[in-house]
């Protein structure tokens, strides 16, 4: 988190969301005080006028600062929180590598693995969405293979330490 005076951080998130989980995990790793407001996106709570007034995209997570500033998109939140900490490298090359893996997660991993998790866990057995599973699983396996390939040569995704 950029060097700012200590402030109250409020996360509007859904506990079952992987994108919310990673924000919560970094907050815990950084030992930052925060308030969690559970927003059940599956029940439409991100589509209310009050929520949409703060986040027109109607998604979680949403980080709200005590001065009213709002930051959305999980990886933008992670970047802002990690800036200036050991969780985001200062060296430009390694910082770019961290961004590479954040982008990879959102564009190659999450669209297959998280969506497959949703289809399997939250849609009825007779849902037409079940037909997507073979394609999602294939894409998920490809994403995991890329990660596995990287980790065969490196202990961590970015840099020499955790």
Regions found by a protein language model. Give the residues of each.
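Proteins with a high burden of low-complexity, intrinsically disordered sequence enriched in S/T/G/P/A and R
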Residues: 108, 160-162
């Amino acid at each position: 988190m950029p060097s700012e005076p200590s402030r109250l951080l409020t996360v509007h998130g859904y506990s079952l969301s992987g994108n919310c989980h990673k924000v919560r995990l970094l907050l815990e790793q950084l030992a930052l005080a925060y308030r969690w407001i559970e927003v059940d996106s599956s029940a439409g709570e991100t589509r209310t006028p009050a929520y949409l007034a703060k986040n027109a995209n109607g998604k979680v997570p949403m980080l709200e600062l005590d001065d009213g500033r709002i930051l959305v998109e999980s990886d933008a939140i992670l970047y802002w929180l990690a800036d200036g900490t050991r969780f985001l490298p200062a060296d430009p090359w390694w910082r770019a590598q961290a961004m590479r893996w954040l982008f990879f997660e959102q564009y190659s991993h999450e669209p297959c693995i998280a969506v497959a998790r949703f289809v399997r866990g939250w849609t009825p057995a007779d849902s037409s969405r079940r037909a997507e599973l073979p394609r999602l699983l294939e894409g998920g396996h490809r994403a995991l293979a890329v990660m596995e390939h990287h980790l065969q040569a490196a202990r961590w995704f970015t840099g020499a330490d955790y």
